[in-house]
Regions:
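Structural/interface elements that position substrates and couple domains in central-metabolism enzymes
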Residues: 1-135
Length: 135
């Protein structure tokens, strides 16, 4: 399972999915967080791979969940979008920007469209793509 976009919401989603357990208590998913190969993206990826949440948070449960995921090694992060080739589920957490021009809201969707194209070119046919946007 991949989570595209490691902003606060995407990073939290990756941690939450990594917490899922089978009835036997085994990690239910191998989760890969994916971000852009930018300085910010690399910093987020590095933090998650070190078991550190990439944003300030007072949510102790999230910090504990990330520590557990790091210990059982079912959460990793990368800037390499080829990981979608082996994903059966992708969760897309890309913010949608709204600009107000002449008091009319204009929704900027180019980041979301680019992410969907990147995933669509690589993810296996029949896989599930879930779009969870923040506005």
């Amino acid at each position: 399972m991949c989570v595209q976009g490691l902003g606060f919401v995407g990073a939290a989603m990756a941690v939450a999915v990594a917490q899922a357990r089978t009835p036997e208590g085994i990690a239910a998913y191998q989760v890969v967080g994916v971000d852009l190969p930018t300085p910010d993206g690399h910093a987020r990826v590095d933090a998650l791979n070190e078991g550190v949440f990439p944003f300030p948070t007072s949510d102790k449960k999230m910090v504990t969940a990330l520590t557990e995921a790091h210990e059982v090694e079912n959460l990793r992060a990368t800037t390499d979008s080829s990981v979608f080739q082996s994903a059966d589920v992708a969760i897309v957490d890309i913010p949608l920007d709204i600009d107000f021009l002449d008091d009319d809201p204009q929704l900027e969707m180019s980041s979301l469209e680019k992410a969907i194209r990147t995933i669509g070119r690589q993810i296996p046919k029949g896989s599930l793509i879930i779009v969870e946007t923040t506005v």
